[in-house]
């Protein structure tokens, strides 16, 4: 184990997702049993004492791969030299808050973090945004980090992707490992479009295996799109462990690559593919290799799918307009 440690920053590190995420990172879930990890943990001042308690627990695990932990509230210090930044912390929507209020509150956070990453992160940095509204938070951070290539920013739609795989597996009786080429299009919101028309179940077209358009429209899509709300209703708190697991999955596949016979969903900056307006951070089917992603090309988009994609990307365009008017980008 002679490899130099990967410096990984996690924001909102004392939060619920952070609590699930840090122990997975430290145990080797990201890059396997041979690559040490150095954790750089960012929190707001009032949460630093709680974060110290989490670090005590990390110490008590005696993880062989955890080479060091640094905590603080200054992104300029915490992001210094990091090669992977997982931006988990975000202002949750409170009672009486409009979506514009949420965008404004998070805008200040992601503006500051984008500028700090631009100033001090490693040249090879990759930035994954989990904190919601993730797509537009990623857009704000990206815009405020002009020296970092735009393709180094991604927002998390892997949780939606994993949810879609799970629902399709349950419907068809297949193992989750039998399902390939699932796609999430658009925003990480209730307008997202989980698309199984290109997916495969044990090598066969998923839509043909299901053979039930009503189930696709009335059950599959809304169940995936509204799963977060269903978990809040059941658990009394938002999904945290599953979001952390998806954050690991997304970062691992980004850094290590996707299998030859599969793709994943990532929200990345649009180049105009599939009619998604250029510059929006929207979810696409992508393959990854060597730390770089490529949008899967040449997929046929039928009229039903077109309408769903357009609805979600219109929401993203509205969010972009809102943060532009707020002077955040």
Swiss-Prot record:
<feature type="binding site">
    <location>
        <position position="163"/>
    </location>
    <ligand>
        <name>substrate</name>
    </ligand>
</feature>
<keyword id="KW-0816">Tricarboxylic acid cycle</keyword>
<feature type="binding site">
    <location>
        <position position="99"/>
    </location>
    <ligand>
        <name>substrate</name>
    </ligand>
</feature>
<dbReference type="GO" id="GO:0006734">
    <property type="term" value="P:NADH metabolic process"/>
</dbReference>
<dbReference type="InterPro" id="IPR036291">
    <property type="entry name" value="NAD(P)-bd_dom_sf"/>
</dbReference>
<feature type="binding site">
    <location>
        <position position="132"/>
    </location>
    <ligand>
        <name>substrate</name>
    </ligand>
</feature>
<dbReference type="GO" id="GO:0005975">
    <property type="term" value="P:carbohydrate metabolic process"/>
</dbReference>
<dbReference type="GO" id="GO:0006108">
    <property type="term" value="P:malate metabolic process"/>
</dbReference>
<dbReference type="GO" id="GO:0005886">
    <property type="term" value="C:plasma membrane"/>
</dbReference>
<protein>
    <recommendedName>
        <fullName>Malate dehydrogenase</fullName>
        <ecNumber>1.1.1.37</ecNumber>
    </recommendedName>
</protein>
<comment type="similarity">
    <text>Belongs to the LDH/MDH superfamily. MDH type 2 family.</text>
</comment>
<dbReference type="GO" id="GO:0006099">
    <property type="term" value="P:tricarboxylic acid cycle"/>
</dbReference>
<keyword id="KW-0560">Oxidoreductase</keyword>
<dbReference type="Pfam" id="PF00056">
    <property type="entry name" value="Ldh_1_N"/>
</dbReference>
<feature type="binding site">
    <location>
        <position position="106"/>
    </location>
    <ligand>
        <name>NAD(+)</name>
    </ligand>
</feature>
<feature type="binding site">
    <location>
        <begin position="12"/>
        <end position="18"/>
    </location>
    <ligand>
        <name>NAD(+)</name>
    </ligand>
</feature>
<feature type="binding site">
    <location>
        <position position="113"/>
    </location>
    <ligand>
        <name>NAD(+)</name>
    </ligand>
</feature>
<dbReference type="InterPro" id="IPR001252">
    <property type="entry name" value="Malate_DH_AS"/>
</dbReference>
<feature type="active site" description="Proton acceptor">
    <location>
        <position position="188"/>
    </location>
</feature>
<dbReference type="InterPro" id="IPR022383">
    <property type="entry name" value="Lactate/malate_DH_C"/>
</dbReference>
<keyword id="KW-0520">NAD</keyword>
<dbReference type="InterPro" id="IPR001236">
    <property type="entry name" value="Lactate/malate_DH_N"/>
</dbReference>
<dbReference type="GO" id="GO:0009274">
    <property type="term" value="C:peptidoglycan-based cell wall"/>
</dbReference>
<dbReference type="Pfam" id="PF02866">
    <property type="entry name" value="Ldh_1_C"/>
</dbReference>
<dbReference type="InterPro" id="IPR001557">
    <property type="entry name" value="L-lactate/malate_DH"/>
</dbReference>
<comment type="function">
    <text>Catalyzes the reversible oxidation of malate to oxaloacetate.</text>
</comment>
<dbReference type="GO" id="GO:0030060">
    <property type="term" value="F:L-malate dehydrogenase (NAD+) activity"/>
</dbReference>
<dbReference type="GO" id="GO:0005829">
    <property type="term" value="C:cytosol"/>
</dbReference>
<dbReference type="InterPro" id="IPR010945">
    <property type="entry name" value="Malate_DH_type2"/>
</dbReference>
<feature type="binding site">
    <location>
        <position position="93"/>
    </location>
    <ligand>
        <name>substrate</name>
    </ligand>
</feature>
<dbReference type="GO" id="GO:0006107">
    <property type="term" value="P:oxaloacetate metabolic process"/>
</dbReference>
<dbReference type="InterPro" id="IPR015955">
    <property type="entry name" value="Lactate_DH/Glyco_Ohase_4_C"/>
</dbReference>
<feature type="binding site">
    <location>
        <begin position="130"/>
        <end position="132"/>
    </location>
    <ligand>
        <name>NAD(+)</name>
    </ligand>
</feature>
